[in-house]
């Protein structure tokens, strides 16, 4: 079963509008989902969409939020998302950060009371596309133990950083856990194992069973280094008044209201070395990286390069598994839509 990007976008828009989401907000949300699937972040693409529908049905996503700036300075702001779709709140927040960075060199915008926003890299690239440096971080409901522990306290807490030169672009989008929780949920849906060394069960024993991993803990990448970074992101993400630690809910469980926070940062190189000089140095460094000698059997890649290749491979459509097809079909049937209008 093949889903084309344009049909994925139409499906998401049509479904969200049935729940009262304004068309423009539905389009923004669909854009983020499609971006994830095209880049190969399938754990945050259409496979995650049924979770949003559950949250909408339960009232944990507000289809028509009153998104407000509750605190502001020339360089900073705090946004209350009124439980709106995270994609809508996130785009508004990064666009505000970019506006501030154009005026004063940097924009830092924190959000609270917003839902899961998809892939963090989408927002960092909004800044990158304005010739700025974009940074996006968020905390998630507990999935990861601190280094040396076996109790879930921290989220998988992703970070995304993006910037570009004239020739190259750099777009890093990664969880601080050894595996994103979305990938475990995807493995559970597909009934496949997760890689070794990513998670432990509830007794602290290594497991490749996604169900046992969800009961237990995901491990931080790089041991204490990943743990330290995840802990820092946990606190920084909440700087706008969101929750931290075990009080963070709703990013994976749609039956709970979302209490996580996000932080969006835009940095304008024009206020530092200058935009053109920054872009020149980006190209100089990445040229050096790309032209360096690779180890046997390896290709040297820049963060974001694989995703760009995936976009070319997947632009004409990609396969979805039977379980996901059935979930989407059920959603369509409930809303009076025909799944065959979207999936070939």
Curated annotation (Swiss-Prot):
Keywords: Coenzyme M biosynthesis, Cytoplasm, NAD, Oxidoreductase. The keyword Cytoplasm applies. Pathway: Cofactor biosynthesis; coenzyme M biosynthesis; sulfoacetaldehyde from phosphoenolpyruvate and sulfite: step 3/4; Cofactor biosynthesis; 5,6,7,8-tetrahydromethanopterin biosynthesis. The keyword Oxidoreductase applies. It is an enzyme of class 1 (oxidoreductase). Catalyzes the reduction of sulfopyruvate to (R)-sulfolactate much more efficiently than the reverse reaction. Also catalyzes the reduction of oxaloacetate, alpha-ketoglutarate, and to a much lower extent, KHTCA, but not pyruvate. Involved in the biosynthesis of both coenzyme M (with (R)-sulfolactate) and methanopterin (with alpha-ketoglutarate). This is L-sulfolactate dehydrogenase. It comes from Methanocaldococcus jannaschii (strain ATCC 43067 / DSM 2661 / JAL-1 / JCM 10045 / NBRC 100440).
């Amino acid at each position: 079963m093949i889903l084309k990007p344009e049909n994925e976008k139409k499906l998401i828009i049509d479904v969200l509008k049935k729940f009262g989401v304004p068309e423009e907000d539905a389009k923004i949300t669909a854009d983020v989902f499609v971006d994830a699937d095209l880049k190969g972040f399938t754990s945050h693409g259409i496979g995650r969409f049924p979770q949003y529908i559950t949250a909408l049905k339960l009232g944990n996503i507000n289809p028509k939020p009153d998104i407000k700036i509750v605190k502001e300075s020339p360089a900073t702001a705090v946004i209350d998302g009124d439980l709106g779709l995270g994609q809508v709140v996130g785009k508004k927040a990064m666009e505000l950060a970019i506006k501030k960075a154009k005026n004063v060199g940097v924009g830092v915008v924190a959000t609270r009371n917003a839902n899961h926003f998809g892939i963090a890299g989408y927002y960092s690239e909004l800044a990158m596309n304005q010739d700025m440096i974009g940074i996006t971080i968020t905390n998630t409901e507990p999935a990861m133990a601190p280094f040396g522990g076996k109790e879930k306290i921290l989220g998988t807490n992703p970070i995304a950083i993006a910037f570009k030169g004239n020739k190259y672009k750099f777009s890093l989008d990664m969880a601080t856990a050894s595996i994103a929780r979305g990938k475990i949920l995807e493995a559970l849906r597909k009934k496949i194992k997760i890689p070794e060394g990513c998670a432990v069960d509830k007794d602290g024993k290594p497991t490749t069973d996604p169900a046992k991993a969800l009961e237990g803990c995901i491990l931080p990448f790089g041991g204490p280094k990943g743990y330290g970074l995840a802990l820092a992101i946990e606190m920084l993400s909440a700087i706008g008044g969101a929750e931290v630690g075990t009080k963070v809910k709703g990013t994976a469980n749609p039956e709970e209201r979302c209490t996580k926070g996000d932080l969006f940062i835009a940095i304008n190189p024009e206020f530092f070395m200058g935009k053109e000089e920054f872009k020149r140095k980006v190209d100089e460094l990445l040229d050096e990286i790309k032209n360096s000698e690779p180890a046997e059997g390896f290709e040297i890649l820049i963060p974001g390069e694989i995703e760009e290749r995936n976009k070319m491979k997947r632009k004409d459509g990609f396969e979805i598994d039977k379980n996901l097809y059935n979930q989407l079909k059920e959603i369509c049937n409930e809303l009076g839509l025909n799944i065959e209008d979207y999936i070939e």
